[in-house]
Design a protein with these regions (language model features):
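Residue-level recognition of single "structural anchor" positions
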Residues: 1-159
């Protein structure tokens, strides 16, 4: 875990016109009653996850997520669903709450499909699960860092 780069070191530079998508996905540790929510922020242009936290669905967890969003991305136009925590924490004029039918969080939803395809612990009806929070976090971070580095490599090839 210590050999993984920091998430911010896997990111492409922010641009003023970047658009962010916020969303969360359900998982559990050991038993389904031990719910964990993966909160993520995706940059639409780069398709990279710029911040994530694992916790409950509270306003406090949303605040933790906001604190992890790099400064250079905080001014960006952003979209989330109507979950109350987003409305309380993301109160800047660049944030918009939208329904799934708007398509404004479709890239984030698509990324969750990729996550579920590669990480069985995020599949809704599964026999795979983490036994400890630390393992759950480690595997998730590993997947996100690998995803971001792959996107960064792809961007360098197209320049």
């Amino acid at each position: 875990m210590k050999s993984l780069p920091k998430l911010k070191d896997t990111l492409l530079p922010a641009r003023p016109d970047d658009i962010l998508e916020y969303d969360e996905a359900w998982s559990f540790v050991l038993k389904k009653i031990n719910k964990r929510w993966l909160w993520t922020v995706l940059c639409r242009r780069t398709r990279q996850i710029i911040a994530f936290v694992i916790g409950d669905r509270s306003e406090n967890t949303c605040r933790r997520l906001w604190k992890k969003v790099p400064i250079e991305y905080r001014h960006c136009l952003s979209y989330s669903d109507f979950w109350d925590a987003y409305q309380k924490v993301l109160q800047h004029e660049a944030h918009h709450a939208v329904g799934k039918e708007s398509g404004q969080t479709s890239h984030m939803e698509r990324w969750y499909c990729t996550l579920r395809q590669h990480q069985a612990r995020y599949v809704r009806k599964t026999l795979s699960f983490s036994k400890r929070d630390a393992f759950h976090h480690m595997v998730t971070k590993w997947f996100i860092v690998d995803h971001n580095l792959a996107r960064k490599q792809l961007a360098s090839l197209t320049l």
